[in-house]
Structures are given as C-alpha cells and as structure tokens.
Amino acid sequence: MSGTHLVVGSGASAAMVALTLASRPDQHVTVLDLGGRLETERRAALQQLAGRDEASWDPVALGAVTAAPAPRGTRGVPQKRTYGSDYPFRDLGQTTGLRSRQPGTNLDVVSSAYGGFTNVWGAQAMPFSRSTFDGWPIAWQEMERHYRATLDEVSLAAEDDDLAGTFPLLNRRSRLPPLGPRAEAVLQRYDAHRERVRGLGLTVGRARLALRADACTRCGLCMTGCPHELIYSAAQTMDRVRRLPNVTYRDRLLVERIGQVGDQAVARCRDLATGERAEFRADRLFVGAGSVGTTRLVLGSSAAPPSRVEMAESRQFVVPFLSARAVEDPRRPGARDFTLNQFNVLVSFDEEDRDTSHVHCYPYNPAYLGALPAPLRHPAASRAATSVLRRLTVGFGYLPSWASPRITVTARRGRSGGLPELDLSAPDTHRPPMLGATLRRLVRAAPALDLWPLPTHVLLSGAGKSYHFGGTFPHRREGAAADGTSTDRWGRLPEWDRVHLVDGSVLPTIASTTFTLTVMANAHRIATEVLAGAGTGPVRPVVELTTECSR
C-alpha cells in the first residue's frame, strides 16, 4: 500500500528510517533537516588531500582540516572538531534556549549537521548484550535481524575474539588495521594471563569500528576527521537516500512543532533563510532529531505535556593508564597508526554481562600533549614527557544508565511559537558506586595486563557529555498502562497514532556499550514493522496546528 512519510533529521536514526521507508518504491519520503555542512573552504582543503599520496599533501590544506579546538578553560574533554570545524555543534536554533545551572553540564546536545553527531563520533559499533533486552519489551531475538540489517549499511571492522561471546559479530566484516604497539602488548598479555583476567570479571578484545578498514592508510588523522572519509557517517546513508526518485530532501528547516490533524501527521517548521513558517503533512511522521531534540519537540507540541521528564544516560568517565614497559615514541618519524579506539576492556559484575562497565582504550594522538600536566609541557621536561607518552593509554569508560545519575529535563514555554526552553540538571552529583568498583577491578588486573589505571586522575564527565543518553519516552511493555511519557513498541505516544519517535528517546535502558548501532537497529525495526502494517491503531487527533503554508 502506498504511503507518504515525513522524517525529521538526518542523523543515525533518521537516516536508517529514511532508507528503510524509501527502499519501497510505493512510499514517498520527505526529509526535513537543518542540514548544516562543513564550510566551503574546509571542504575544498579536504578535497585537496583526498585520494592523494600523503607525501604530496599541501601543509596549508592539512592545517585547515586538522585544527584543534580552542581551550575552554574548564577541566574535561574538549568539544571535538571534524576537519577543523565545529559545524556539528553550531547553533542554528536547535540549542537556543537550552541551559543549566550546573557547571560542567553539556549543552551541545542537539546537532544541526547533515548526518548529525555521526560526523564526530568514535565509530564504535557494538550491539547491546542479550541480557540488556531482558528489561525491554523487545527481545534480543527480535532485534537481531535489525542489527544485521543495520550492519548491511554500516561497514564493520572487527575481529572474532572473547568479546564475541557477549557481543556477536552478526555480519560480514573486514579486519582492523594493524594495531599500535601498546594495544598489541596488552592483547598479548591478556592471552597469556587470560584465565586470571577473566576470573576478575574482565574481558579484553579488539575494537569494533564502523570503518572501511581495507582502505585505511594509517595516516593518524582519525580523531580530527578521516581525509579519505572512511569512518561511517549517517551523511553517507542520506546521500544514498537522496538519490532515490521517491525522496524529497528539504534543508535549512527547523522543526518547531509536531502533531496530527485528522488522519494526517504534521510537522511545522521555520525556514532559516526567510524566517517564514511552513507546515508539512503526510500519512506518518518519524521523528529522529536526537534524544534531546525529539524530547524538546514533544514537550513543545503535546496538548498536556509534563513539566519535566527524566533522561537516562550511560555516564562517561576518563581514566588514564600507564604501563611499566615502554613502547617506541609514538611521535617518532615514520610512525603510522590509526587513532580510533583500538581495544576494549569489559568489566562485568554478573554472569549475564548486563551490569558492566565498558572502557574504550585509545592510542596516542596529538591532543595528549595538551592534556599533560603543565610541568611536563615545559621544554625542559621533554625527556620526561616522552617517557610518559611511551607508556600512556587513555580510556573512555561508560557505565550503564541504571548505574548512572539521571538528567532532569524541565520545559518552559518558548517565544513566538518557537521551541520550548529547556533546563538540564543532574541532581545526583555523587560519584556512581559502579565507577569505584570498576576502578578496583582494573587495578587488580593491572599486573597481568601491564595497564595501570591512575585513580587519582580519573575524570567523571559532566552530565550529557557521553552523548549516550535518551529514554525520556521509553517503549513500554505490551499491556502496561499508557501514560504521557512512554511509547508503544513503534514509538507512539498515546495522543498521536501517526507520529513515531525513532531515536534514543525511546530506548528503555542504555547499556555501557556504545549505543549508536542499537539506535539505528531499533529505528530500522520501527520503520520495518510500520511498513508491514503494524502500529495502525485508530487515529486520535489531539494537536491542531495552524496552517501557514501547506506542502
């Protein structure tokens, strides 16, 4: 049966929904997007580098696309850049009106970029464990096929190792690029002391990356933006979607209201170029504006919104490791390495690998120099700094949402019919108990792995900094009472039968493993089931939007 659909956004979930819907020629898809892009001059510089031998790279062009972010004067992980640009975070209206009274709270939580935050992600692509879905209304057996379908779209570089027992590989893959000497040393020691380390509840394995690894040149620029564009971005999927004849893409639009009129779903937008407002209608609306962006739309559009909602987060922490045995200086002439996460340490507190902390371990990249203590950055301390860099590994760790502080989102009416203002706060400021338990396990395993955590230098990132957040409108179990802050398995709130939330906002829980692959798989599941005729209950229009311009 033919149908028309609106898709809000172009990030991971929106791209997967648009691809799924548009794969049916009888379905017409209109994508409404802010569509922020890399600046023209940086795009030109990138094109000068792409496909050329690195020895012939223009230093000026290289400098333009590898510029580091300016220090903000605060302790913590700096805002990431891609090709020297902050365009994924640039405010085109999507973060205006977001605030927090708590220092350190991340407010760069909605992307304006074409492709969303996949332009700056770490490319880790792992499913949630089977046991995570015991707390969901959707079982692992249902999700597995959608993980596989997602990995048909996302290139995976991975190895079959001990992590596969909990996180199956699920699909074809390429091998990772050669690992750096520190990663190889840790993995060799893990193999030699495997029984001892596993007895402590730790599993060590290679990274799982959304990367076309077979073309990787190991130029070392992963963290500033791959010059060959080998790291997956949802923009790549959207590029493919936009070439289909049954897809219309509209950018420079800020969606401000969503709802239903009669048997049609409605999205009301503001044109960024003209300031004029327009209304789009279709049979169904799929909202993939990111967890906070979608939450904001719902709170501003619902007939009787709650004054506040709770958002789950897989809280991030940063842990530096030192090793007794040094490797070669990572800055030595001719050194080649890829700088994405190279190996993972899973710390498990149960037999089912549900209560876990997941640590992604990164090799050297130039940002480490600026993060060294001030005395080590002095020229007179260059030998000491070199000694540290030959031993240093940085881990980005995550806790599951049920062991992490929650974020309270409070809404206030916006101005002139625009988006509501939001206040983000994390009332619980205590260090999560699981973090301490994780560090103790890592210390106990350190002699076997020669990977010694520095507990005194562990940083618990501010609320929202992990970017693994959502669950404001979680899927509820079948038969559970419907309320204004839960959705059915197709992402529908009780008042809208034709509006589907499809991003992280509907995840019931967030495991400690990275969640982008799960967000994409769940979005694919929703779109696939809707196309198959599910989620077609009686229409109950609630929100009537004034038509200023119909499309």
Language-model features and meaning:
Residues 257-279:
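Conserved beta-strand-loop-beta-strand element in the redox core of flavoprotein oxidoreductases
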Residues 509-527:
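A conserved FAD-binding loop/helix module that cradles the flavin
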Residues 2-3, 275-284, 288:
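Core beta-strand elements of the Rossmann-like FAD/NAD(P) dinucleotide-binding domain
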Residues 3-141, 305-338, 521, 525, ...:
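N-terminal glycine-rich phosphate/pyrophosphate-binding loop and immediately adjacent elements
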Residues 373-448, 452:
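C-terminal catalytic lobe of FAD-dependent flavoproteins
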Residues 90-95, 210, 215-222, 256-259, ...:
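A glycine-rich dinucleotide-binding beta-alpha-beta segment and adjacent secondary-structure elements
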Residues 57, 61-90, 100-103, 107, ...:
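Conserved redox-cofactor binding core of oxidoreductases
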Residues 36, 45-87, 248, 256, ...:
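Mid-to-C-terminal "cap/lid" subdomains and adjacent gly/pro-rich loops that border
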